[in-house]
């Protein structure tokens, strides 16, 4: 008999739910195709489901035909991308997570106060590329305490830091500690820039590890937050695997295993978790229980540009992208509200 213990919380966060809903509603209002720059979230199942509905995923705006509705992914984009869309007159709906937008605003504010800005994150991640491109000024990217030590910046320089939202909480704390050790004047948000969902899921996996012999994380290989969950299991000394769904289960993993801890990254839908449970059931008898944990009631408002898409479709007029972008900026403070 294998016991499966489910982490709580797990799976979709508010930013992912919002991003998927934006694409769904855009398709409902204007019909296919709707173009999406980059994967809307890092999960192949989600992307394939939206493709089947008529979403077309591209990496560059040059791949978008003139006049076609375009959605920016939850990870955010550089200002140059926004400008290119405006110059081409593309109707844009920005699905950037409000918590990522918050990081952009913090970075700009720190620079405006004359501080040297340090961004903690993983080079090459779409969120990092977007953040670097949203801040008009020099930004020093570091991903580890060792990289902090190699920064060629005088120790008495006033510095500020911001962070990628999907980092390991513990790793980020070590980088922040290195910054405070190297510089005499450091300000920043501690780990509060790491989003609530990332922190909650990491804490839940740590609790899961205390009761499990094996950790399974449902998520895609390019999902930063999913990889961090697997790393926590490994750090706790448990065999830990990142899998897309139940089809990737290997029976060998369960030899001598009594209790399996099961969780999912913030971009993985619950149906994939259930597919893993089904696959384990095929190996023999199982019981399933769920840990007590944080109940997430956060939701983010959809951007007002979706309403413009509906009006544009009804009147057969072109969306004024400049006006939409202005309204989006004006509503940023409202978009970032966390609602129960």
From Swiss-Prot:
Output the NCBIfam families linked to this UniProt entry: ispH_lytB (TIGR00216), PRK01045.1-2 (NF002188), PRK01045.1-4 (NF002190)
Its gene is ispH
Q: Which UniProt keywords apply?
A: 4Fe-4S, Iron, Iron-sulfur, Isoprene biosynthesis, Metal-binding, Oxidoreductase
Top-level EC class: oxidoreductase
Q: In which pathway does it act?
A: Isoprenoid biosynthesis; dimethylallyl diphosphate biosynthesis; dimethylallyl diphosphate from (2E)-4-hydroxy-3-methylbutenyl diphosphate: step 1/1; Isoprenoid biosynthesis; isopentenyl diphosphate biosynthesis via DXP pathway; isopentenyl diphosphate from 1-deoxy-D-xylulose 5-phosphate: step 6/6
Q: Name the Gene3D superfamilies for this protein.
A: 3.40.50.11270, 4-hydroxy-3-methylbut-2-enyl diphosphate reductase, catalytic domain (3.40.1010.20)
Query: What family is this?
Result: Belongs to the IspH family.
Q: Which cofactor does it need?
A: [4Fe-4S] cluster
Q: Which reaction does it catalyse?
A: isopentenyl diphosphate + 2 oxidized [2Fe-2S]-[ferredoxin] + H2O = (2E)-4-hydroxy-3-methylbut-2-enyl diphosphate + 2 reduced [2Fe-2S]-[ferredoxin] + 2 H(+); dimethylallyl diphosphate + 2 oxidized [2Fe-2S]-[ferredoxin] + H2O = (2E)-4-hydroxy-3-methylbut-2-enyl diphosphate + 2 reduced [2Fe-2S]-[ferredoxin] + 2 H(+)
The record, for Pfam families, names: LYTB
Tell me the GO molecular function terms. 4 iron, 4 sulfur cluster binding; 4-hydroxy-3-methylbut-2-enyl diphosphate reductase activity; metal ion binding
Q: Which residues form the active site?
A: 127
Bias-annotated ranges (Polar residues): 331-340
Task: Tell me the organism.
Answer: Zymomonas mobilis subsp. mobilis (strain ATCC 31821 / ZM4 / CP4)
Membrane-crossing segments per the record: none
Q: What does this protein do?
A: Catalyzes the conversion of 1-hydroxy-2-methyl-2-(E)-butenyl 4-diphosphate (HMBPP) into a mixture of isopentenyl diphosphate (IPP) and dimethylallyl diphosphate (DMAPP). Acts in the terminal step of the DOXP/MEP pathway for isoprenoid precursor biosynthesis.
Instruction: Give the note describing cofactor binding and stoichiometry.
Output: Binds 1 [4Fe-4S] cluster per subunit.
Binding site residues for isopentenyl diphosphate: 42, 75, 125, 223-225, 267
Name of the protein in question: 4-hydroxy-3-methylbut-2-enyl diphosphate reductase
Q: Report residues binding [4Fe-4S] cluster.
A: 13, 97, 195
Provide the residue positions that the database annotates as binding (2E)-4-hydroxy-3-methylbut-2-enyl diphosphate: 42, 75, 125, 165, 223-225, 267
Question: Per the record's keyword annotation, is Iron included, yes or no?
Answer: yes
Chain positions recorded as dimethylallyl diphosphate binding sites:
42, 75, 125, 223-225, 267
